[in-house]
Amino acid sequence: YIGADGRVYFRYSTKGMTFRRNTIYDLGAPVEKAGTSVVLEPKYYTEGVSYVYGGRENIFPAVVSDVTDASFTSLPDGWRARLEKDRLVVIPDTESERGNYEIQLFAYAEGAKADIYTFRFKYDPALILYDGFDGSDIDDRYWRRFNDHHGTLWSWFQTGDEAQSPVADGKLQLKAVYEDGAYKTGAVTGQNLLDYEPPFRVDCRAAMSRRETGFWCAVWTVPTTGYQNGEIDIMEAGNHYTSSDFTSKIHCTCHNPYTLNTPSKKYEGFRPGQDQPQSGSAVLDNPNDYHIYSVEVTDEAVTWYADGVQIHQYKNIRHTTDDNGYKYAAESTTSSAGETIYPKANYLKNYPFMENRYFAIFDIAVGSSFVGGTNKKDEVPATEGFNAQFDIDWIKISKIK
């Protein structure tokens, strides 16, 4: 019988019984014995708050013990789920509408009470990821701490340590400090964990809670095939060593093989009347406070927003081999920075943003020419007491239909 506590009890001292509920699932319920019980504790699950996402398995690592058998007694139409030895897996029907959904799991241990677990999830067919950083650490299904020192300016001082990227007070805190004679900075990346295809939109609520001269921070989305194939910086900001104008603004930009092989590496500028900078900037009220930074990537344009207001756009100006820009482009030349570039080979690669899958990165960094400093790591001036912080309240990644 089912007791007032919702558990199933058996009255007789036999090995067990099987029965069928009107859900068509066959379930087993053994005799209850003292000292044994079912344990099922999913990680990253908060009732009525946790999302599940369409088009992929949603894995909730779980402590599962003393479970002899388990069956799902209630699932939304078209949904699938399974309980494994160390995880709960939920697969929504991609045709489901946005809303709240519930699944029920009947589990029992040998000689124990049978328990019914109810899990309540949120589902949005357009949503790829929502993370409010409400736990005690990053969700390692989607994020890892970055410590790949590949020589790029922003990665100079990345430690990969939790001390530089803790989760606390409902936010991801990225810290840049100078201690023990060295700079230490934090970054978190979704590389090799969660990637998504265009068209998409990324929204991120973030704040520069502590600023120092020479610090800079960014939220960006990067092609899985490499930064040069369409990196999009959703927001960048920092304290310039000399320019108060730079410091007062937030910045956004995109990179592609074409712009990286123009003399200035900045402009779509081969055709009169169609020049468009790859970068933009804006002055925000109370720039250190929380703002929502966004980007939309479609076949027509990459468009940036701050608090819902458009601040820049890079359009898909379709290049062809009939353009004079292609006909008269040099095979190779030298950029304003003294680097060898290849304009002709890359002329047609000005809008690769629809060709790649992307992942997200958050970071805080120190030094480099971006903030008016040196591009030599060992020459970044030491600043005792340096303590900058960039806080991420939440990130939302969505499909665009």
Can you annotate each of these PLM segments?
Residues Y1, V31, W79-L83, D161-A168, ...:
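Short, exposed beta-strand/loop patches in secreted or surface proteins that constitute
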Residues F10-G35, A388-K401:
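A recurrent domain-boundary module in secreted/ectodomain proteins
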Residues Y9-F10, I91-P92, R98-G99, A107, ...:
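GH16 jelly-roll
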Residues Y108-I116:
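Short, exposed coil/turn segments at beta-strand boundaries within extracellular/luminal domains
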Residues E32-S71, Y117-F121, P125:
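Solvent-exposed, low-complexity, repeat-rich "mucin-like" stalks and linkers
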